[in-house]
């Protein structure tokens, strides 16, 4: 059987979502570990006045591609930008570009999707479902196509507690929903959205479930596989540990915790935190395309790319490692010392929100106003609470995913491919991974230099001293007010003080008698 690099040798590959987090890592890994890949076509839209080619050039100049550029200085010549807008009819692609792709593409990786949990149903359907269908129509015309890989999510069927590696019946016929959306106005769509998504938490998981069904139905004549990653996090090993470049998912919460802004969150300490490193997802995806391309299985394979079943990690452990890492290696200009309390109790959660989030933010904004600056902390807290609300469904529940196909895929790799395209999460050491993840947010998201650590530690110690001083003054003031108004409190206070003096006198007397 061909090795994975041999399979990709001489192949033309198409990637959607190549400028996204996972797409970048997929592109880098493909070019670096399969150096004889002929060309990689990436669908990119115009953005902020930049042409697709300029966006790709800028992307490939970032730190993620440093190792690739060192090994293959001319690697950028293999990457061909195709102007495309996935939300437009026929992907807004020129006839010339369509003909090029139809004539030469061997492998398709469809990674593009909206990952915003609060996206409107219309927009989520457009990118996650309709764009997928249009890409499948284009793929059906490709003369040399060997395999089509659709990247979904392990939470597409989160309304089930036990999730098999199969495509489940959709909650509604995608075709009928698409037709209905054409005549509905936005107000009506928003009104019916809660009824449509039912027991799913958001439009993202709902539309990803519909997209899987579309892939199964519309791509029945194609050689297709689906990869379902869970919560995609920073890189484990490749191209280096801790690579992360966005605030999405848990990354933004980790940063908020490190800054001392996030103090409480609704979550179950014992719920499984099914984090999956991005390089594990990429290696699984490349291996899935190899297996389907070489063996051409009769049925479409689905791979649940998760960690909970083989190497479980819990949200309570996540909280511990995040806080301990940021206490040792603090972020610059922290608002408060890192400390987070996870709770699943509704009343306790709202109490801590008021005491630990809103009250300090309000006081800080008052201080900013007094000093002539613009208040900003309450706005930050409001944005943080929105993000927390979107994630609490996933931090409060656990799921069981079947991983038989993923384990089978791993067993089919040669010893060399297992080293180069490793996705065995049993080898993942969570404490080390979480430290690299947190440090990755510091270095690559916030762009903080490690040389600034001494100053950051000094600032954290200053915050600790301020906290101790404030708490001491607060306790003394409250106690003094309480004593002044209550005879019983005064009696207790005098009794405690007298007992302390008696104890000290006894201690001194006993010490003197020894000599």
Swiss-Prot record:
It catalyses: a long-chain fatty acyl-CoA + 2 NADPH + 2 H(+) = a long-chain primary fatty alcohol + 2 NADP(+) + CoA; hexadecanoyl-CoA + 2 NADPH + 2 H(+) = hexadecan-1-ol + 2 NADP(+) + CoA; octadecanoyl-CoA + 2 NADPH + 2 H(+) = octadecan-1-ol + 2 NADP(+) + CoA; (9Z)-octadecenoyl-CoA + 2 NADPH + 2 H(+) = (9Z)-octadecen-1-ol + 2 NADP(+) + CoA. Its EC number is 1.2.1.84. Residues 485-515 are peroxisomal. GO terms for molecular function: alcohol-forming long-chain fatty acyl-CoA reductase activity; alcohol-forming very long-chain fatty acyl-CoA reductase activity. Keywords: Lipid biosynthesis, Lipid metabolism, Membrane, NADP, Oxidoreductase, Peroxisome, Transmembrane, Transmembrane helix. One of its GO terms (biological process) is long-chain fatty-acyl-CoA metabolic process. The chain crosses the membrane at residues 466-484. Residues 1-465 are cytoplasmic. It holds the Pfam family NAD_binding_4. InterPro entries: FAR, FAR_C, Far_NAD-bd, NAD(P)-bd_dom_sf. It is a single-pass membrane protein. Its main location: membrane. It is found in: Peroxisome membrane. Belongs to the fatty acyl-CoA reductase family. Catalyzes the reduction of saturated and unsaturated C16 or C18 fatty acyl-CoA to fatty alcohols. It plays an essential role in the production of ether lipids/plasmalogens which synthesis requires fatty alcohols. In parallel, it is also required for wax monoesters production since fatty alcohols also constitute a substrate for their synthesis. This is Fatty acyl-CoA reductase 1.
């Amino acid at each position: 059987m061909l090795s994975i690099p041999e399979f990709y040798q001489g192949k033309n590959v198409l990637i959607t979502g190549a400028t996204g987090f996972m797409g970048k890592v997929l592109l880098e890994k493909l070019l670096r570990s399969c150096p004889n890949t002929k060309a990689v076509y990436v669908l990119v839209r115009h953005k902020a006045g930049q042409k697709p080619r300029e966006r790709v050039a800028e992307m490939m100049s970032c730190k993620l591609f440093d190792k690739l550029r060192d090994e293959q200085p001319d690697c950028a010549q293999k990457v061909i930008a195709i102007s495309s807008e996935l939300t437009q009819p026929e992907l807004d692609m020129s006839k010339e570009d369509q003909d090029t792709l139809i004539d030469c593409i061997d492998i398709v990786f469809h990674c593009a999707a909206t990952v915003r949990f609060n996206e409107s149903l219309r927009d989520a359907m457009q990118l996650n479902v309709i764009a997928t269908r249009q890409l499948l129509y284009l793929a059906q015309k490709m003369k040399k196509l060997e395999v089509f890989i659709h990247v979904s999510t392990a939470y597409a069927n989160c309304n089930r507690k036990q999730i098999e590696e199969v495509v489940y019946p959709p909650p509604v016929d995608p075709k009928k929903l698409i037709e209905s959306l054409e005549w509905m106005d936005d107000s009506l769509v928003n009104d019916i959205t809660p009824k449509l998504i039912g027991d799913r938490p958001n439009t993202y998981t709902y539309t990803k479930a519909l997209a899987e069904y579309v892939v199964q139905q519309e791509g029945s004549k194609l050689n297709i596989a689906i990869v379902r990653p869970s919560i995609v996090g920073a890189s484990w090993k490749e191209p280096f540990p801790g690579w992360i470049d966005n605030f999405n998912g848990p990354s933004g919460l980790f940063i908020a915790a490190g800054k001392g802004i996030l103090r409480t969150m609704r979550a179950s300490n014992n719920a499984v935190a099914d984090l999956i490193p991005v390089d594990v997802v990429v290696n699984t995806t490349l291996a899935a395309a190899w297996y389907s391309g070489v063996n051409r299985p009769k049925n479409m394979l689905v791979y649940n790319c998760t960690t909970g079943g083989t190497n479980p990690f819990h949200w309570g452990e996540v909280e511990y490692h995040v806080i301990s890492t940021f206490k040792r290696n603090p972020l610059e200009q922290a608002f408060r010392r890192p400390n987070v309390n996870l709770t699943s109790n509704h009343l306790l959660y709202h109490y801590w929100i008021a005491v630990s989030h809103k009250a300090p933010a309000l006081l800080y904004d008052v201080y900013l106003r007094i000093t002539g600056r613009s208040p900003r902390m309450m706005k930050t807290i409001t944005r943080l609470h929105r993000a927390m609300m979107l994630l609490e469904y996933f931090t409060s529940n656990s799921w069981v995913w079947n991983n038989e196909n993923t384990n089978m895929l791993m067993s089919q790799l040669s010893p060399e491919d297992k080293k180069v395209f490793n996705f065995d999460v049993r080898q993942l050491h969570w404490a080390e991974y979480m430290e690299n993840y947190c440090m990755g947010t510091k270095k690559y998201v916030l762009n903080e230099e490690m040389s600034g650590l001494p100053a950051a530690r000094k600032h954290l110690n200053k915050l600790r001293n301020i906290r101790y001083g404030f708490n001491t003054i607060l306790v003394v003031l409250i106690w003094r007010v309480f004593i002044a108004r209550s005879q019983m409190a005064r009696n207790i206070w005098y009794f405690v003080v007298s007992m302390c003096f008696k104890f000290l006198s006894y201690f001194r007397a006993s010490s003197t008698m020894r000599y």
